[in-house]
Amino acid sequence: MPRYAQLVMGPAGSGKSTYCSTMVQHCEALNRSVQVVNLDPAAEHFNYPVMADIRELIEVDDVMEDDSLRFGPNGGLVFCMEYFANNFDWLENCLGHVEDDYILFDCPGQIELYTHLPVMKQLVQQLEQWEFRVCGVFLVDSQFMVESFKFISGILAALSAMISLEIPQVNIMTKMDLLSKKAKKEIEKFLDPDMYSLLEDSTGDLRSQKFKKLTKPVCGLVDDYSMVRFLPYDQSDEESMNIVLQHIDFAIQYGEDLEFKEPKEHEEESSSMFDEYFQERQNE
């Protein structure tokens, strides 16, 4: 039987560890067994039990304190991840060979691990050799994404990971529970956006002609091919968490031997997929 994995990615502070913690609790409520593996050698603490912790293999602080290496924080992290890639047997021993595993990998936030280095791609390939079906879960902070240009920046980061890893990817806006009512209403247009409309709304802020020329084809690429879209993740709302989990399960065909339902928004194409969610939040 296949095994299943989520690679939980995103910038520092986007809520990766919180996502892992709340998703584990949500799955436990559904009587589903989910484990977490910490792959951030610079992590200080997290609010969930782990089945494996990369810090047992190597830690950033130890690398930075090594006088023969003399790495800073970023260099130390890269060294740790490259060392990890050369010691996948450690991870294999930690994971064991249990069928039907479902594991969340809490990954580091540095974008260069996905754009410039082969480490995460090598991890994906190794997991696939171990018969894992892997889905990327890319997180961005919804509070950061309420402005058009920041949203485009978040899209480029998500797109970089998607292209580099070549696996199904679900993109999520986290910390929806921290937004004001006004911000929640504003952010709905960013979940399944019309990129050309967003560009038109913000052209007055584009002072550089070169920047305008760059932004327009980027928006066109995303819009024409429907390459990036986002789901809202509100850890205080079970329905929001369930929608996210349904999309991920659908991407990796979790429980394909069971009767499976497609994510809810496919059932009613004529209406916005999150109209009900936002209406409930605005009425609170």
Curated annotation (Swiss-Prot):
What keywords would UniProt list here? GTP-binding, Hydrolase, Nucleotide-binding
SUPFAM superfamilies assigned: P-loop containing nucleoside triphosphate hydrolases (SSF52540)
In this chain, the site described as Stabilizes the phosphate intermediate is at N74
Question: Hydrolase as a keyword?
Answer: yes
Which residues does the annotation say bind GTP? Answer: G13, S14, G15, K16, S17, T18, T174, K175, M176, D177
The molecular function GO annotations come to: GTP binding; GTPase activity
PANTHER family given for it?
GPN-LOOP GTPASE 3, XPA-BINDING PROTEIN 1-RELATED
Quaternary assembly: Heterodimer with GPN1. Binds to RNA polymerase II (RNAPII). Interacts directly with subunits RPB4 and RPB7 and the CTD of RPB1.
Protein name stated in the entry: GPN-loop GTPase 3
Source organism of this protein record = Rattus norvegicus
